[in-house]
From Swiss-Prot:
Domain of life: Bacteria
Keyword Glycosyltransferase among record annotations: no
Gene name per UniProt: ybfI
Keyword annotations of the record: DNA-binding, Repeat, Transcription, Transcription regulation
Gene3D superfamilies assigned to the protein according to its UniProt record, in alphabetical order: Homeodomain-like (1.10.10.60), Jelly Rolls (2.60.120.10)
Residue range(s) of DNA binding per entry: 188-209, 235-258
Protein name per Swiss-Prot or TrEMBL: Uncharacterized HTH-type transcriptional regulator YbfI
Residue span, HTH araC/xylS-type domain: 171-268
Keyword set includes Transcription regulation: yes
One GO term (biological process): regulation of DNA-templated transcription
A GO molecular-function descriptor: cis-regulatory region sequence-specific DNA binding
């Protein structure tokens, strides 16, 4: 689409990623990340599904995704999306939480949308400072303030113990897919692994994980491809190593989940490596 902007900035002080999408119409299918996402809508309206909950999100709404939260979103009434977010890896979150609370426990955010929240302004200022590479001290203050408010008021440690554990069979399937994501896995392979019929496996996995086995494996592939691209591996080689049939196949799924093409993503990390 013309006049759309897709950018990713790496912050060398906070060790987090800052994404910005402007004027996009893209639908993001059900997927998950291995990191925390804290974002907000600047313009547009979206339908969001996250962990079996549905929302209509608008400008000013703050979004919170935990690692492995399955979520999807799409535009409403043909409106384009302006969106900013920061991605925080679990180890960075753990260090920040320890500074704030003295505890090394990772937070779990049970509220995925904070409607018209005042913290959105703090996140917006933080994102702009990261993008402009300015005011390191102010930036670090904002980051810790933002996390402190979210952890103290919106994280729920007790919630972790009440989250239903997937069945042993579903755990086996997840582990198998995470080990064999680069292979041509079939539903029959998973059926034999669990002793379940194909239909029962597909239905049970989707119900318990909120995502189909194939979408789960595609997400694992994309996450692995990101790691390879960050190391400077060429997209064509990353596609081969992660089980995609070719580079165009990987590009299609990569852009659907990440919002950038593999080449765009790789170039950002190339720039950081040469600083």
């Amino acid at each position: 689409m013309q006049n759309e902007t897709r950018t990713l900035q790496l912050d060398p002080h906070l060790h987090i990623e800052a994404y910005r999408f402007k004027g996009i119409m893209q639908k993001f299918p059900n997927h998950f990340h291995d990191y925390y996402v804290i974002g907000f809508i600047e313009k547009g309206q979206r339908y969001l599904a996250c962990q079996d909950q549905e929302y209509i999100i608008n400008p000013g709404d703050l979004l919170l995704f935990n690692p492995r939260d399955t979520h999807s979103c799409e535009q409403i009434d043909g409106r384009t999306l302006d969106y900013r977010c920061i991605n925080v890896m679990p180890d960075i979150m753990e260090k920040a939480v320890k500074e704030i609370t003295g505890s090394g426990h990772l937070p779990y955010f049970s509220q995925h949308v904070l409607f018209r929240h005042e913290l959105t302004a703090s996140l917006q200022e933080l994102h702009i400072l990261i993008s402009e590479e300015k005011q390191a001290l102010r930036k670090e203050e904002l980051f810790l303030h933002l996390l402190e408010e979210l952890i103290r008021h919106y994280s729920d440690v007790t919630f972790l113990s009440s989250v239903p554990e997937p069945s042993d069979e579903v755990k086996m399937v997840c582990e198998f897919l995470e080990e064999h994501y680069a292979e041509n896995v079939t539903l029959n392979d998973l059926s034999e692994l669990t002793g379940w019929s194909k239909y029962h496996l597909l239905r049970s996995f989707t119900k318990q994980k909120g995502i189909t086995p194939n979408s789960y494996m595609e997400t694992i592939r994309i996450n692995q491809a990101k790691k390879l691209l960050e190391q400077g591996v060429r997209p064509i080689d990353a596609a081969f190593q992660t089980g995609f049939s070719d580079q165009s196949h990987m590009t299609k799924f990569f852009k659907r989940q990440v919002g950038l093409t593999p080449k765009q993503y790789m170039k950002i990390f190339e720039k950081e490596l040469h600083r």
